[in-house]
Amino acid sequence: MKYIAIDLGLKRIGLAYSAHKDLVTPLKAVERKNRDQAARDVKKTLIEWEVDAVVVGIPLGGSSEDEMRRRVAHFMNLVAFEGEIFYQDESNSSIEAESMMRGEIKYIRDGRIDSISAMIILQRYLRQKC
């Protein structure tokens, strides 16, 4: 099964891909100018990589969980993805990503950290599933 993970942010959307449970690759992040443009760009990536399922990171257990689920559901509606959508706890994934990249891109905001976060989210999902 082919997966893409999405780390949905206000400025950038991190993406990561896996066709095998032991290998997850960060992809180029989507710059988010507006919702419609971001949804089109994400959909294009999903089609290009021929994915079967999407794993979306959401913060579980916090007071904002319901609101985030609503926002994610709205965004995925705009993407109009026909495959399966799974949710995975994204807690601390950005902190982990920054720790992994420490020193390399401290001041660069090009989406690499966002896509590393998506990679971590997908790794967590695949570890729990398999």
From Swiss-Prot:
InterPro entries: RNaseH-like_sf (IPR012337), YqgF (IPR005227), YqgF/RNaseH-like_dom (IPR006641), YqgF/RNaseH-like_dom_sf (IPR037027). It is found in: Cytoplasm. SMART domains: YqgFc (SM00732). Keywords: Cytoplasm, Hydrolase, Nuclease, Ribosome biogenesis. Pfam families: RuvX (PF03652). The keyword Cytoplasm applies. One of its GO terms (cellular component) is cytosol. Its EC number is 3.1.-.-. One of its GO terms (biological process) is rRNA 5'-end processing. Gene3D superfamilies: YqgF/RNase H-like domain (3.30.420.140). GO terms for molecular function: nuclease activity. It is an enzyme of class 3 (hydrolase). Could be a nuclease involved in processing of the 5'-end of pre-16S rRNA. HAMAP family: Nuclease_YqgF. NCBIfam families: PRK00109.2-2, RNAse_H_YqgF. PANTHER family: POLYNUCLEOTIDYL TRANSFERASE, RIBONUCLEASE H-LIKE SUPERFAMILY PROTEIN. Belongs to the YqgF nuclease family. This is Putative pre-16S rRNA nuclease. It comes from Sulfurimonas denitrificans (strain ATCC 33889 / DSM 1251). The lineage of its organism: Bacteria, Pseudomonadati, Campylobacterota, Epsilonproteobacteria, Campylobacterales.
